[in-house]
Amino acid sequence: MRWLWPLGVSLAVALAAGPERAPRGVWLQQGGHQPVAQEQPDRSRRGAEREDAKGLQQYVPEGWAEYPRPIRPAALQPTQPWVAASPSPDRARATGGSGQEPQGNVTGPPGQRPQVQNPLYPVTERSYGAYAVLLLALLLFAVGIVGSLAVMCIVWHSYYLKSAWNSVLASLALWDFLVLFFCLPVVTFHEITKQRLLGAVSCRAVPFVEVSSLGVTTFSLCALGIDRFHVATSTLPKARPIEPCPSILAKLAVIWVGSMTLAAPELLLWQLVREPSPAAGTVDTCIMKPSAHLPESLYSLVLTYQNARMWWSFGCYFCLPVLFTVTCQLVTWRVRGTPGRKPESRPGPQEPRGARPSSTVAGLAAVHALCALPENVCNVVAAYLSAALTRQTLELLGLVTQFSTFFKAALTPLLLLCVSRPLGRAFLDCCCCCCGEGCGEGCGGRAAPAGPRAKLHTELSASGYFHKPREAPPLLALGTPC
């Protein structure tokens, strides 16, 4: 019985320690001397992981991560790109579970909302420049919008002015209207407040519309020069055949599609960058930088366009229309001055003399050259002397480049109304009718002649611009009833 005393001692110790201090997994076999350790089944909640299997990155319920997350050398390095975490899990669940909102191609200090600055009040040194830019923008906007709408409405409502020539002029007026209506407010707002309207969308859309407008002007000048040369060298009789409407639409489609295709790389070239500023808080800047997420072939194409963009614009949008117009004018004058050459057919009453003068093409080319020259000079200076220039100088060069395009868009329809006699006459008649003076009275202080002959002349001139003829015209109409 001596072997029973160790058993009694162990039982006494176990009872004295209690069930809380008894070692887990220690069980006594009735027929043995040594304890055998058995594994207890894990009583943790089903689906829960062990603490040692979890990652090193722990989340505190009330301490949400900031953007960007700080990288600690001792912690686990993140393998996913930084994501802006939402301030609460409910908001993250409402936005789709991730809490990430699309930011486009915006880079800069995150988590900081852009603050719109108002330099107009209170008046400071910067206010004078802001007021000058605002007044100039308002003047260009008013003149350009009124002129563009006038040209488009006259060509659209006039029966005898719906020709290929006038349709090209109306196309120019339409693109000038788009540039002034969409691009001018965005550029002016950015210059005053240093914030970009519509963000990255306007950063890409504004250059695309401006370059497309340059392409439309270039191809339109080439088309007008060719048309003027055909008119000068044509041997057709005075009553020319009517040009069908599909032919006019095909010419306009070639001009528009070609211009927009050449301007398509602008949509992939520009990106919006937000930089911190001690004065304005955040400054939006549009830079030429292709996105790294583009395919390899497309990225190389856009990069090639970026490297050749300056000289491509100078050659295609400045040299080509100017040289082409000058060449066509010289050849036309040479042909018209040839001895034995019959003069051009005299236009009829429905198309007054000067409907297609050479001065219209020459004036359009001169305005385009004068407005595009400062833009190209600023681009060359900014490209080759950017290291020696200050930031303020570069911003001034960019502003001159933008407003050169706006000057061209505002002056082109005004030139058409002043140089083209049918457009100018129709505009004056429309102004007289709107002022309540009546189309029968003379405009500009001229007295209307009395008599039935003068009345017939007035009716013919008015119906030729705004209404379809009630009876068959004495000559074949030169316009196309589209």
From Swiss-Prot:
Sugar-modified residues: 105
Sequence segments annotated as region (Disordered): 25-56, 78-119, 338-358
PTM comment: Undergoes metalloprotease-mediated cleavage which reduces its constitutive activity.
Residues in compartment: Extracellular: 26-134, 189-205, 273-310, 383-398
Record carries keyword Transmembrane helix: yes
Comp. bias regions, Basic and acidic residues: 40-54
Family the entry assigns: Belongs to the G-protein coupled receptor 1 family.
Domain of life: Eukaryota
Stretches that traverse the bilayer: 135-155, 168-188, 206-226, 252-272, 311-331, 362-382, 399-419
Function: G-protein coupled receptor. Has been shown to bind the neuroprotective and glioprotective factor prosaposin (PSAP), leading to endocytosis followed by an ERK phosphorylation cascade. However, other studies have shown that prosaposin does not increase activity. It has been suggested that GPR37L1 is a constitutively active receptor which signals through the guanine nucleotide-binding protein G(s) subunit alpha. Participates in the regulation of postnatal cerebellar development by modulating the Shh pathway.
First-listed, main subcellular location of the protein, grouped into a coarse class: membrane
Gene3D superfamilies assigned to the protein according to its UniProt record, in alphabetical order: Rhodopsin 7-helix transmembrane proteins (1.20.1070.10)
Pfam families the UniProt entry points to: 7tm_1 (PF00001)
Cytoplasmic side: 156-167, 227-251, 332-361, 420-482
Protein localization: Cell membrane; Cell projection, Cilium membrane
Organism of origin: Bos taurus (Bovine)
InterPro entries according to UniProt: GPCR_Rhodpsn (IPR000276), GPCR_Rhodpsn_7TM (IPR017452), GPR37_orph (IPR003909)
Protein name: G-protein coupled receptor 37-like 1
Cystine pairings recorded for this chain: 203-286
GO cellular component, one term: ciliary membrane
Signal peptide segment: 1-25
